[in-house]
């Protein structure tokens, strides 16, 4: 694992790359991300053959751009892919034509609200070609001239040059507990020259991984799986190739747009009032935040993970909306280190509670002889816990998680968990994992 001085410095390494769905620069991005992941995380890049059916979708081809520009018939260059990869519509078809302005205009894209900026436009599945430019440049184009549009692109279907995603796994103290399952943290990597959407979420996830590796979750907790790849189709392809993992996933967080100066927003799970929702709301009590419905804008891979036929409860964290979205103004200038770290902190607190939570089930009969087993809590040292002891023990029937119990008795989760652990160590309760809700059909 490479050391880093700031999350923004990591982002600066892959921000300028043309990291579209499947491309050489996307491969480089995954390699850069891997270099900063903890050495113990077994960071692995998976490759899927283009055009392979994955559920109702197909794995996309690798996209290669050799050259692309738009110029006047006199040779005056208007936009050039070499200057900025956003100048062409992502996954544009090859073209080499001389056109009138009227013929060219349907293939030109700009942002009305930000006339100085180049928009990011993609047509992954609606195959066409196009150029992106500032509205100010568009307005200056002579209407009576001819234009030369050149895009030398190809769609590679060689299985050896396939579509890639990456995963890493960080275990709790003492190693994995297979029965506890895994918690999934995702960030997508496929938006070229976009710093906040999506590079910021990637580096916040890297920071979360570092924290969980340096200060592991308690023994017996879930492992935390990190996933990096192209939005939507990346998760679909990964899950379609790894369906056996789905029942093992107990919850998830999708992270994006974490670097701008908005308050944090979280989107509920599809279940709406799931344990994961309650834990998130609990952890954000003292944080200025906004709460949103599942899959409200900006909806991303939680629609796959928590969608039909998968159903793993998943929230998302972001700082959307922001005016620079999907333009060249979404650059390093709008990224703030404290925002990146703040999002990692929020995610960490949610993960630490959810992944360490379990269901305690009693083995004892009758009230436990507390003082005889070192389980008495002196009221002079902790009045609140002393008054809650009976309530806690009455909830050891295997119907409540530790978080449920803490919520019901009105105490901090970690206070209650530490106390319940004493019962487990004495053999008075056994720990049972959070049940799987993942579907495989």
Label the model's feature ranges.
Residues 1-312, 316-441:
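N-terminal hydrophobic/helix-forming segments and targeting peptides
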């Amino acid at each position: 694992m490479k050391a880093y001085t700031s999350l923004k410095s990591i982002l600066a390494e892959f921000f300028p790359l043309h990291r579209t769905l499947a491309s050489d620069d996307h491969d480089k991005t995954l390699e850069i991300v891997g270099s900063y992941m903890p050495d113990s995380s077994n960071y692995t890049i998976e490759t899927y053959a283009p055009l392979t059916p994955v559920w109702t979708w197909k794995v996309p081809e690798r996209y290669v751009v050799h050259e692309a520009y738009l110029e006047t018939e006199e040779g005056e260059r208007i936009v050039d892919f070499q200057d900025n990869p956003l100048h062409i519509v992502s996954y544009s078809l090859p073209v080499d034509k001389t056109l009138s302005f009227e013929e060219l205009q349907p293939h030109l894209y700009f942002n009305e609200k930000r006339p100085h900026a180049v928009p990011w436009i993609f047509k992954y599945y609606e195959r066409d070609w196009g150029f992106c430019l500032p509205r100010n440049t568009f307005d200056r184009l002579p209407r009576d001239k001819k234009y030369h549009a050149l895009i030398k692109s190809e769609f590679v279907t060689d299985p050896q040059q396939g579509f890639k995603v990456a995963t890493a796994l960080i275990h709790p103290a003492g190693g994995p507990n297979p029965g506890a399952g895994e918690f999934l943290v995702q960030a997508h990597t496929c938006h070229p020259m976009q710093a906040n959407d999506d590079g910021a979420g990637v580096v916040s996830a890297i920071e979360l991984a570092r924290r969980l590796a340096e200060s592991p979750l308690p023994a017996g907790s879930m492992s935390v799986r990190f996933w990096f790849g192209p939005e939507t189709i990346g998760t679909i392809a990964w899950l379609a190739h790894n369906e056996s993992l789905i029942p093992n996933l107990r919850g998830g967080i999708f992270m994006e747009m974490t670097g701008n100066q908005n308050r944090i927003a979280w989107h509920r799970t599809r279940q709406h009032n799931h344990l994961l929702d309650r834990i998130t709301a609990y952890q954000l009590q003292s944080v200025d935040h906004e709460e949103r419905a599942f899959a409200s804008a900006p909806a991303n891979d939680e629609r796959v993970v928590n969608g039909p036929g998968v159903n793993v409860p998943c929230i998302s964290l972001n700082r959307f909306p922001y005016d620079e979205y999907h333009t060249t103004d979404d650059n390093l200038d709008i990224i703030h280190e404290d925002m990146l770290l703040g999002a990692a902190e929020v995610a960490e607190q949610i993960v630490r509670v959810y992944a360490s939570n379990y269901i305690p089930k009693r083995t004892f009969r009758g009230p436990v002889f507390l003082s005889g087993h070192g389980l008495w809590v002196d009221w002079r040292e902790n009045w609140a816990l002393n008054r809650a002891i009976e309530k806690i023990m009455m909830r050891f029937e295997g119907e409540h998680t530790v978080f449920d119990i803490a919520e019901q008795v009105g105490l901090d989760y970690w206070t209650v968990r530490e106390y319940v652990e004493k019962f487990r160590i004495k053999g008075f309760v056994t720990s049972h994992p959070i049940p799987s809700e993942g579907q495989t059909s």
